[in-house]
Amino acid sequence: PPDDDNADMRDIVRDWIWYGYHAASAIDDWIDACAARGDGFDLPWIKAFARAERQHKRAAEAQWPAATDCDRLDHAFAHLAGQGFCALQWAGDTLDDGFERVSQTINADDVPTERYTTGFCFFHSQDMDHALDDEGLSVAFGHVDPDSDEDNVRMGRLVFEALEWVGLKP
């Protein structure tokens, strides 16, 4: 039954399933937790929707190539991390969230100061939504301690090269 609460929850569940960052059990646990706190949606309907959406995604995945753009993106971000980048995927829901996550990651107490010496790059959920709509994936980037705009431009070039290196078209 599509009322506002059900429609909102349906949209979030669909996004989380297609983003691919959470196991089905984690999404189900999150749905249960939202219901337990009284979020006002129809729990059986949302659970049925989640099951059907997972089946739909599995059918789509069966048609995907062995190496997907997501796999290539993982490799590019791992490569950048190896070069001293703070490379974060799904860094919140907005650009501001992403910058905050980068700052938290770089400045965490258990992170050696020499770990993130080069730059940072990230994307957030709105960027993933655009990618799922075939509008491309935006990746934010910059130098961790820029002396000039050229430092940030150089980081952009490194991100571009890493994406190109794994076969993505930046």
Which residues fall in each region the model found?
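A short, surface-exposed helix-loop junction/capping segment
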Residues: 52-61, 138-144
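Repeat-associated, polar segments at repeat-unit boundaries in modular proteins
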Residues: 33-58
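Short glycine-rich, low-complexity/disordered patches
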Residues: 25-33, 47, 87-96, 162-170
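N-terminal leader/presequence regions that precede the main folded/catalytic core
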Residues: 1-35
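Structured alpha/beta or helical-core interaction and ligand-binding surfaces enriched in interleaved
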Residues: 57-114
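Acidic, proline/glycine-rich low-complexity IDRs
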Residues: 1, 134, 138-170
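An N-terminal amphipathic alpha-helical segment
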Residues: 100-138
